[in-house]
Amino acid sequence: MSKEIKFGNDSRSKMLNGVNILADAVKITLGPKGRNVVIDKSYGAPQITKDGVTVAKEIELEDKFENMGAQMVKDVASQTNDAAGDGTTTATVLAQAIIADGLKAVAAGMNPMDLKRGIDQTVKAAVAELKKLSTPCSDSKAITQVGTISANSDHEIGEIIAQAMQKVGNQGVITVEEGQGLETELDVVEGMQFDRGYLSPYFMTNHESGTVELENPYILLVDKKIGNIRELLPTLEAVAKASKPLLIIAEDVEGEALATLVVNNMRGIVKVCAVKAPGFGDRRKAMLQDIATLTGGTVISEEIGLDMEKVQLEDLGQAKRVVINKDETTIIDGIGDESVINARVSQIKQQIEASTSDYDKEKLQERSAKLAGGVAVIKVGASTEVEMKEKKDRVDDALHATRAAVEEGVVAGGGVALVRVAAILKGLTGENEDQNVGIRVALRAMEAPLRQIVENCGEEASVVANNVRQGEGNYGYNATTGEYGDMLEMGIIDPTKVARSALQFAASVAALMITTECMITDRPVAASAAAPDMGGMGGMGGMM
């Protein structure tokens, strides 16, 4: 296929057009008074969002050269989202500002490579200054503020995220689901829960709630199917003598074995319940081992030479309480040794770092949290499906932002931190004048997020930016109320990781785009050439 090629200013102006189209659509969502974007869907209701990366991902341009520019800025938003979970709109605004000023400098005859070096030098220095300005985010109040800001000033969402982090710890697993009602609720599952219920309703002990409740049970963990009751008899006899209930977790319990367990349970000979082990294949083996670690038991597996007929009481795990319904099993207060549990959690964390799959990472994080202390589920409530999706996006953003804040601390929000960093770096110089221009391009761009927030409020950006520049420390502009003051005291804070990631990714892609001299794409195919008429088939004449 033949190619279309553009050089120099021709290529750069097309690329800038694409950047501007995407950035203009994204940046109207920035700040507390940012507007919504409505996205048409090929099925279902349109999506309403204020999430920068969601808007960016929807944009594809007809002109292939413009589209290349748009896709590169889309990459800025995606990378920032992957690294920090928020700050995608800020990153897009920064990238647009650096690219626009940088391309003007190239058109004026500056050396693109020196401009890039100047920009890179500035960003490196700015990241170091951001870390100095950062303050730790450890208390519940600060976490609430970060969540509130990231959820578009929705205090309810900030409060719920802070409560969730309080319950399961800063590193605990917090998942977001669509709720059934109008209110957003927090559901905390203490202990280890997995999505397997009882194998027979005849095991039920509480018919009102439809659950099996076992107090101080023994727990038998088996990595195979159990079909023959003879294998289970020694364990059942030992547990019956100890006058304790028994929970069996196995690949499956079927036929004669299941029927005998049900009969024993109904006659009151031994209180017992059987459930399938969670997961499949290697993941099932790993999760059985997790349960064994938590309950101080041993997984009975023929692979390591353990036979079910020789099981002793010492091989069984124990817990304070187990609650099982038709869908889930929850093990509360296993008696496992804390040092062994911590070692298992550390081992899983190493696997998370080594994993390249997002799905595997998510599953490993869930396993780690279940061992470490529980899972919190935020159930998002809304009146309509459209509102539900929009609100769920905001909760996801807020959750990522609070995690980032706990990780690297917080700085003054509303674009103020970057303005302060730019002021500190005013005296920065490069090796030549072209590098100095690159430094000035990056420093000017650092004001762009503040200016855009103010523009989205309908105020005069230059006046506000000038007032903020003249202030010191955390002094800034509260876009919600239109007042000036200490941003930290007003609760307007940004995670340092979000500000840092936005600046680094924006500058990285923008600097590369400034050094572009040639663009190549497939030449558009004419419609007539793309779909030739179907010829006649032998013996059938021409086809109409």
Swiss-Prot record:
Q: Where does ATP bind?
A: T29, L30, G31, P32, K50, D86, G87, T88, T89, T90, G414, D494
What quaternary structure, including any partners, is listed in this protein's UniProt entry? Forms a cylinder of 14 subunits composed of two heptameric rings stacked back-to-back. Interacts with the co-chaperonin GroES.
Enzymatic class? isomerase
Which keywords annotate this record? ATP-binding, Chaperone, Cytoplasm, Isomerase, Nucleotide-binding
Q: Which gene encodes it?
A: groEL1
Q: Some GO term, biological process aspect, for this entry: which one?
A: protein refolding
Protein EC: 5.6.1.7
> Catalysed reaction(s)?
ATP + H2O + a folded polypeptide = ADP + phosphate + an unfolded polypeptide
Recorded GO CC terms: cytoplasm
Report the protein's function. Answer: Together with its co-chaperonin GroES, plays an essential role in assisting protein folding. The GroEL-GroES system forms a nano-cage that allows encapsulation of the non-native substrate proteins and provides a physical environment optimized to promote and accelerate protein folding.
What is the protein's given name?
Answer: Chaperonin GroEL 1
PROSITE patterns, per the entry:
CHAPERONINS_CPN60
The organism of origin for this protein: Psychromonas ingrahamii (strain DSM 17664 / CCUG 51855 / 37)
The lineage's top-level taxon is Bacteria
Gene Ontology MF term list: ATP binding; ATP-dependent protein folding chaperone; isomerase activity; unfolded protein binding
InterPro entries noted in UniProt: Chaperonin_Cpn60_CS, Cpn60/GroEL, Cpn60/GroEL/TCP-1, GroEL-like_apical_dom_sf, GROEL-like_equatorial_sf, TCP-1-like_intermed_sf
